[in-house]
Amino acid sequence: MTPTLTRVTEQVDRQTFWRGWLDAHLPAEMAGKLTGVVEREGALVIFAESSAWSARLRYAVQEIEAQIRASGPGITEVSVRVLPRGAKA
């Protein structure tokens, strides 16, 4: 596998891991409003479909941030942003 393909594969694996992890640790209605998640350079960025859901998600993430960091030891920052459905990260 080429280095680029390896990096992309690892990135997809991390997105899949975090999406499943968040689905399991957030309330079902909130997990359904996630539009993406990206782990990059020690930062975990969680995307919500609207600004209203982003605000609610920020509070929920604050409550589980210690668990997030325990599950991803390299995570030094967790943030929530808006990414409407159908938009590209």
Report each predicted region and the residues it spans.
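A short interface-forming secondary-structure element
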Residues: 41-61, 87
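N-terminal presequence-like segments and adjacent domain-start helices
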Residues: 1-28, 32-41, 62, 70-89
